[in-house]
Amino acid sequence: MTTALLLLGCPELPVQTSLTLYLLSGLRDAGIEVAVAGTDAALSLLTVADPKGHYVDPAELHNLDTCIESLAEQRRDFDLCVVFVHSDTGLSYLGTVQGISKARLVAIIFGREADALVEQITFECETLVAKAVHKIGRAHV
């Protein structure tokens, strides 16, 4: 495996940015070239989280829709694609990539509805599932 794509959706849950930086570090340490595609907000948060560019290569940050278009038109493909899923939209992107890419597909499914989301996957892919949400409670003074 020499190339990987990390596909980010809306950064509603902060854990997505941290996990992306963690994966960027590990994959790059393994000698894998990594591209990241995401919404403008997700890419901006990622860039802000790594101001000195230790993990994020600005040349390998791509608009989500443009990246999907490149995959669909077979202008680019990857050996591994990791899709972050915390909503139905993430499931749609996961299904789209499964249909247009030859990459080994891994879904990182997180959020309050993680268990329900994983049950909706009807095709072969690896899954990592964790609720990974902040538990807001009353402050005790």
Where are these regions (language model features)?
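Nucleotide-activated donor-dependent transferases that construct or modify glycoconjugates
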Residues: T3-P11
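Short acidic, S/G/P-rich loop/turn micro-motifs used as interaction or catalytic elements
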Residues: P11-V15, A42, V85-S92, E113-A114
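Histidine-anchored nucleotide/phosphate-binding helix
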Residues: T17-D29
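Short internal beta-strands
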Residues: E33-T39, V106-G111
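N-terminal beta-loop-helix "entrance" segment that forms/cooperates
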Residues: D40-H62
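Glycine-rich, charge-decorated loop segments at or immediately adjacent to ligand/cofactor-binding or catalytic sites
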Residues: T47, E113-E126
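N-terminal glycine-rich phosphate/adenylate-binding segment common to multiple enzyme folds
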Residues: R76-L105
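Conserved small/polar residues in nucleotide/adenosyl-binding loops
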Residues: A139-V141
